[in-house]
Design a protein with these regions (language model features):
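Mature extracytoplasmic enzyme cores
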Residues: 1-169
Length: 169
């Protein structure tokens, strides 16, 4: 667990389980494999390359180059079932370190609440107590705004902006 303390307050996290990930099955062009259908148009995936080092059990390190694809929704994965993209709110917000820093520097509950407004750690419950006898619990999440005509527990069609989340609660 994450725990923070200073002379004035203490806080900790437990993990909560909000539904933060959406998976989309992409429709790939039959001849141009780096293109996918989106709103009746063929769009090219953003393509980058990563250099990885894979260490084997015997200590041998093998360099690997991997092509990385990105769609309107986010990163793309290919497997035997098709091509899928996923959206995760955490990929849009990289301010967790800043929030934890501000939480640790808080001198009172008002400072702590200001740190929480950063919303950099949307998948943790937060428990807080201070020397002024304040006790606080929050089940924290950035829940995507989703169109109710889709079943978001299933894989979604990746060919329409209608399935893209529209912000957060």
């Amino acid at each position: 667990p994450f725990i923070g303390t200073n002379p004035n307050l203490a806080w900790t996290h437990t993990y909560n389980f909000p539904d933060l990930i959406d998976v989309y099955q992409m429709e790939i062009h039959s001849k141009k494999k780096n293109y996918y259908k989106y709103d009746h148009e063929w769009k090219k995936f953003e393509i980058s390359r990563a250099k990885l080092k894979v260490k084997l059990n015997n200590g041998l390190v093998i360099p690997l180059r991997k092509k990385i694809l990105w769609s309107e929704y986010g990163p793309v994965l290919k497997n035997d079932s098709g091509v899928f993209s996923f959206h995760l709110s955490a990929l849009e917000n990289i301010s967790a370190i800043e929030q934890w820093y501000q939480m640790n520097k808080a001198e009172n509950f008002e400072d702590f609440k200001r740190a929480l407004k950063i919303m950099g750690i949307p998948r943790f419950n937060i428990v807080y107590a201070d020397k002024q006898d304040n006790i606080f619990y929050m089940s924290n999440a950035l829940i995507p705004l989703r169109d109710t005509i889709y079943n978001w527990e299933l894989t979604l069609p990746g060919n329409s902006s209608k399935t893209k989340t529209k912000g957060y609660y």
